[in-house]
């Protein structure tokens, strides 16, 4: 997977490229990330990248010319088939379905806004999609871009040690994850559920599914409204509701 980053602060992405699963993916050439800083496309000695908005009001906007030129340069390197994404509070809210949808793209450019945002005409002419990571405001698009990179990279073949992990994580099937346990067997008087030490893989699977359903029902019941539950899931959910009534 190839990802281009348009950012005034490309150094922030060391958190993605040098550490953890994504850092390993970069070192193994499974994930390639390139950067374009709009400051490098300015012509004045101050490398100005902000400008006043028409109509007045507080704050500044990113200057059109440096940002547009940076996007064009990134597009020319990426070639055909690249999708340009602007990280914006006005965008489609990211969820696991959105992550899997984005992961099907082999080439993406993430445009990270700053100040009060970017000129609407750039959105209309240069941006393919807008995405948001939640209903709150951040100081820039870098953290949302890193969130998207981390999430989609998990679906790149061979990035995870066990590819099934991406399919078994929270939200992979629209449900919250089940509880997990490791050694020691007892911790502060609490013990590991016996079923997990039984060696019965089918019973363990059923226990995990029930726990996942229960967590979702108790903590995020709205997630269940959009799911087409299997017969097994429906029966387990009925049991859960009876046990908690």
Curated annotation (Swiss-Prot):
Keyword Magnesium: no
Annotated residues for binding of S-adenosyl-L-methionine: 113, 133-138
Family: Belongs to the RNA methyltransferase TrmD family.
Organism name: Histophilus somni (strain 2336)
Complex and partners: Homodimer.
CDD domains: TrmD-like
An example Gene Ontology CC term for this record: cytosol
Official protein name in the record: tRNA (guanine-N(1)-)-methyltransferase
Listed EC numbers: 2.1.1.228
